[in-house]
Amino acid sequence: MAEKILVVGGGGREHAIIKALKKSPDCGEIWCAPGNGGISYDAKCKNIKATDVDTMVGFAVEEKFDYVVVAQDDPLALGMVDALAKVGIPAFGPDKAAARIEASKVFSKDLMKKYGIPTAKYETFDDPAKVMDYIRAEGKYPVVIKADGLALGKGVLICENEQQAADGVKEIMLDKKFGASGNHVVVEEFLTGPEVSVLSFTDGKVVKPMVSSMDHKRANDHDTGLNTGGMGTIAPNPYYTPEVAAECMEKIFLPTIRAMNAEGCPFKGCLYFGLMLTPDGPKVIEYNCRFGDPETQVVLPLLESDLLHIMQACTNGTLAEQEVKFSDGAAACVILASGGYPVAYEKGKPISGLVDGQLPGEENVTVYHSGTAITEDGQLVTNGGRVLGVTATGPRLTNALSHAYEAAEKISFEKLHKRSDIGLRALKALAEKQ
């Protein structure tokens, strides 16, 4: 029977989830809250803040949704899945206790230390003076300072010297740039090596990893500029070999699920492993308790299995029996951002080149909407820092990348900013392998 589904969130990740869910024969009416302009071409949108748990749950009850996908980190940390369970609505995503794996860096680092999961050496602090005493005593730069709580992916500072570290501590702990998220900080050693993102499905018992991906966090080419939510992605990640995958499953993925069970907070949903392949082997840089953005925009287009069935198997504890299959191809996503992102940027710029939110006549290309709105007279306009993600799939990474960039050239808005080097590091790695 066709199911009525609500997706909570309003960015490119949610758009990718909706497009993948719609391929399921069991997916009926689909809604997104709050959604955005571009998502409204694919789903009915209801303007409720993702963090307004009570209103969202009330809406879910009123509209009699069969299943809710909580795609954003904030509502998960606020316990939206718990609140839905209380009114008898099944949901995809971890409960509040399990969502701490992302919502608190201190919780996740202490978890890894306790259960022997490889990660960077670290200390946690709630006193700014003690942070600087520790950093001076260690005397090693660069050093990484992380806000404990959620900070839209921007709460991590890499400090090259004592002055930068002092400025970073002031920004997070004294100026409260991220509010209460900066009451505690984690200070950790700087790791080197290729980064890999691995999203995984889990029902708290088994882990089924998705195809690996590589994010590009910095705003500008050659990995310069400020950290962003992500300026583009590719999948699969060439550094993530079958040997590395086997080691990660044995030393990181399964131990993490077992650790959460042992702590009395089993994790169900999408667990994202941010990894670094160091000279000492793979180590965890971060966990996210939900799909990554823009990793989702390259991972889900390669999924061949039924996403709705997989999600429900995670909720029901039946993932072991559920097929999770990805195509052998590749995908690349190029983010089109507003000029000035991730700091100050303007909104409301008309977007040209799209028809009903997509590029007409383009095969194997999908445009995912991160920050768009539709004006009263029907004009699609920019409405965020990251505006669109142009994803192309192909048999190989070279095809996917060239196609994504060709397609991106057909879209324009005032002060559009994109990186021109998405995937270049991955292509070099592939060339070295051959």
Where are the regions a protein language model picked out?
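Active-site "cap" helix and flanking loop/linker of ATP-utilizing ligase/carboxylase catalytic domains
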Residues: 249-271, 288-362, 375
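Generic C-terminus detector
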Residues: 372-377, 381-434
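Short, charged, surface-exposed secondary-structure boundary motifs
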Residues: 40-43, 57-58, 100-106, 220-221
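Solvent-exposed alpha-helices and their adjacent loops that cap or buttress functional pockets
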Residues: 23, 38-40, 62, 92, ...
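Internal nucleotide-binding/catalytic subdomain
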Residues: 156-296
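ATP-binding N-terminal substructure of ATP-dependent carboxylate-amine bond-forming enzymes
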Residues: 1-96
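Active-site nucleotide/adenylate-binding loops and adjacent lid/helix of ATP-dependent enzymes
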Residues: 6-7, 102-184, 214, 238-254
